């Protein structure tokens, strides 16, 4: 559906009903699938034929939604996972192994920071974290001979820094490695990282894509542009025979358009299991169908609240790239011309005590760990999502102790501003 707009892809990509078939995608709630002969099933296990044999690896409902997300991002292949964390782990571990190295932006979601800095380190995969504002020279200096990928978030959670995707992609490609970008906050409605040079795009579909706080999920999209065989020495998992699949070499058999997702499905999903359920995929698709309508409203509310907060005497600073005063405004105009998202972060004069009083006084904004929902919610990340970080790490990640992250939902912006104003008045 390359010729169609993003809105049309949100509604119709991935599934075309045949004559007399369901207009809505079917939920294939089955663990397994029947075949007439052992030979037919054997072809699936040999990756010689397309089809399904066990829903831990693939399911028709999940594949339908994955195809839609691939079309929305402009990729050649995609897969769903059980969560955004699973998507990021699979995307990185698919091309990394013990002894390898990652270069990652320091301004990322706390759970992802911990995944890279602690959990993957236990697997023998080390990382160097760089500022999202690092110069080309500084980025180059972070590379080692064993570096296998770069990672960053289009809009960081919760610092809301904006990644210079084009620069990160340029440096990554000069070193012969792919750039993986988590595009959760802007969604492909507001930014498509592949158009700026990213090779792999990940999502927590739990957020805006679902949009209603109803289903957990993640997604990985492959651009199909990175030439794995041109860097075969770096990526033996893709470019040498896989003994667990009869000696298949993924990059040779499936080409650069299909090797990454095929290996991720056939190998990692087989061994680790984190597949999204068909029911969750169905509900995710319902969210995707209205994503292009919802995102402008989230951006509108985010912009209105950011402007209100910027002029309030009890607010020390506001992080929102839609504000002309924001350090990322010019970069956002490049990558996010239609706006980024509905998430605003800000610091209150008075530190943690003021933050606590503010959140306690909110009526429309619920205190919860979720973000990017139809309903407004808020959080103090230093005491919740990022509490595993020490003070130095919090500073590097752009998450000081007084920071509040507020995710503006789809309520009326006048009511939201009034509620926030009343909560600010409660600070003594």
What name fits each language-model region?
Residues 221, 345-347, 407-409:
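Short hydrophobic/aromatic beta-strand micro-patches
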Residues 7-16, 78-311:
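Conserved PLP-enzyme active-site core in the AAT-like
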Residues 32, 223-226, 348-351:
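Short loop segments at secondary-structure junctions
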Residues 272-275, 279-281, 286, 290, ...:
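Conserved small-domain helix->loop->beta segment predominantly found in fold-type I
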Residues 1-59, 67, 404:
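N-terminal "arm"/small-domain region of PLP-dependent enzymes with the aminotransferase-like
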């Amino acid at each position: 559906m390359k010729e169609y707009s993003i809105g049309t892809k949100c509604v119709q990509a991935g599934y075309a009903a045949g004559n007399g078939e369901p207009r809505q995608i079917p939920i294939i709630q089955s663990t397994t699938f029947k075949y007439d002969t052992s030979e037919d099933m054997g072809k699936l296990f040999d990756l010689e034929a397309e089809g399904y044999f066990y829903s831990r690896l693939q399911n028709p409902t999940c594949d339908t939604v994955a195809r839609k997300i691939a079309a929305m991002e402009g990729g050649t292949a995609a897969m769903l996972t059980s969560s955004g964390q699973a998507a990021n782990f699979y995307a990185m571990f698919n091309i990394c192994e013990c002894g390898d190295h990652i270069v990652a932006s320091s301004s990322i979601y706390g759970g992802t920071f911990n995944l890279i800095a602690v959990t993957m380190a236990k697997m023998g995969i080390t990382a160097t974290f760089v500022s999202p504002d690092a110069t080309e020279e500084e980025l180059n200096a972070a590379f080692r001979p064993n570096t296998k990928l770069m990672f960053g978030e289009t809009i960081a959670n919760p610092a809301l820094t904006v990644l210079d995707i084009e620069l990160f992609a340029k440096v990554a490609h000069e070193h012969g490695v792919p750039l993986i970008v988590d595009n959760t906050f802007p969604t492909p409605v507001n930014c498509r990282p592949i158009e700026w040079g990213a090779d792999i795009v990940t999502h927590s579909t739990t957020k805006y894509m679902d949009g209603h706080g109803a289903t957990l999920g993640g997604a990985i999209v492959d651009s199909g542009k990175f030439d794995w065989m041109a860097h075969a020495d770096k990526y033996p998992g893709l470019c040498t025979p896989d003994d667990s699949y009869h000696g298949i070499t993924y990059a040779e058999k499936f080409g650069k358009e299909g090797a990454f997702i095929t290996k991720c499905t056939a190998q990692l999903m087989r061994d680790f299991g984190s597949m999204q359920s068909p029911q969750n995929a169905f509900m995710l698709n319902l969210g995707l169908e209205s994503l292009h309508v919802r995102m402008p409203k989230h951006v509108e509310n985010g912009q209105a609240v950011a402007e209100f907060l910027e002029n309030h005497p009890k607010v020390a600073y506001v992080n929102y790239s839609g504000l002309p005063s924001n350090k990322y405004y010019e970069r956002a105009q490049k990558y996010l011309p239609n706006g980024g998202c509905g998430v605003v972060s800000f610091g209150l004069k008075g530190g943690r005590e003021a933050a606590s009083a503010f959140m306690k006084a909110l009526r429309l904004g619920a205190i919860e760990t979720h973000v990017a929902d139809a309903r407004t919610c808020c959080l103090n990340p230093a005491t919740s999502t990022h509490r595993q970080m020490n003070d130095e790490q919090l500073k590097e990640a752009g998450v000081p102790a007084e920071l509040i992250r507020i995710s503006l939902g789809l309520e009326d912006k006048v009511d939201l501003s009034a509620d926030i104003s009343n909560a600010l008045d409660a600070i003594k």
